[in-house]
Amino acid sequence: MHRYLRGGRIDVQEIAAELGLGRTTVYRWFGSREKLIGQVVARAGEPALRAARAQARGTGGQALLETFDGFNRFLADNRVLRTFVERERDAALRIITSGAGTVHPRMVEMISGLIVAEIEAGNYVAPVEPDTLGYAIVRLGEAFLFNDTAGMRGDVDRLRDVEAAILGVSTPERGREAPR
């Protein structure tokens, strides 16, 4: 994980040597280099999402929007993640966005958990089932932050506007109060 956080290329042979293990053991534990990187990326994202939630003000949809916006800005500004996506684009997109991988399902679980917590606290009424909303929020983030197809990669302001609309949160740009 430290190698990833320093921005270095993740080489299974080097990691195995650092841990005093054989490369085969590392592959047995994780299955593949991509799964190993997925574990590292998911684990690195968890404290960032918790920090974004801790810094968000208010409750309900507004707190969710601020949390997601803070997390998205962390991802967009993260030099190490950007370097990884630029250096290994195809592998990075598979690792980050695959439903069969580690990162995407873990992010959906964490985002859905935040939504459920606001619902259970009586602070938010979700427009759809929380797991569906969590999935949509994560996919939106992936599209706006990592997919260059529409020329909007890294556009966190536009991402915030779309998330606000989906969450039913009023923003100064939208100017009207949406149902919570």
Over which residues does each language-model region extend?
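Short, basic, alpha-helical segments at the C-terminal edge of helix-turn-helix-like DNA-binding modules
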Residues: 41-50
